[in-house]
Amino acid sequence: MATHLVYPLLTAEAFLQIDFGDQKAELDNGVIRMMAGGTARHARVQGNIFLALALRLRGSGCTPYNSDMAVRTRPDSIRYPDVSVFGGHDGKSDDDAIAFDDPRAVFEVLSDGTARTDLRVKLDEYRALPSVDTIIFIDIANKRVRIVQRTGPGGWVDNSYDDPTEVAIPTLDITIPHAEIFARD
């Protein structure tokens, strides 16, 4: 007779207490999902976005975070966007935070292994957060940018750009040139 192990589903709070060491994981509907490492190209584009945001947002009250900062998207889901921007978390009381639940903008750098989840599951989770105004997907293989922006209660506009375009983020009052996102130096 076969034995089936049944594991209890985790809450976001329980998940955040687990030390995964060098490994990365997300919590998806109470289930731990291990994450693979990225490529050099992925890391470069992620770094370019973070740097562009950090330089433009300094002194604005908004702070960009890399993928070390967790976003609590639901009581049973924790995500680690490639880059996220939060407002109002710049006080000393937030210095030891490991997760926030109110990003204003979220960036996901797509890879073959994550694109399906990023473009479906995570998009829905991010859109459900009242604080999120802008979700940006970066397709590094094709140098495409997809910008999903809130237009009001329940309204969203979704634009994809195949040609180089400036990435405007009205909620943050900044623009990032396409060339800066994909820069190799």
Residue ranges and their predicted role:
Residues M1-D185:
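Gly/Pro/Ser/Thr-rich low-complexity, intrinsically disordered segments predominantly at protein N-termini
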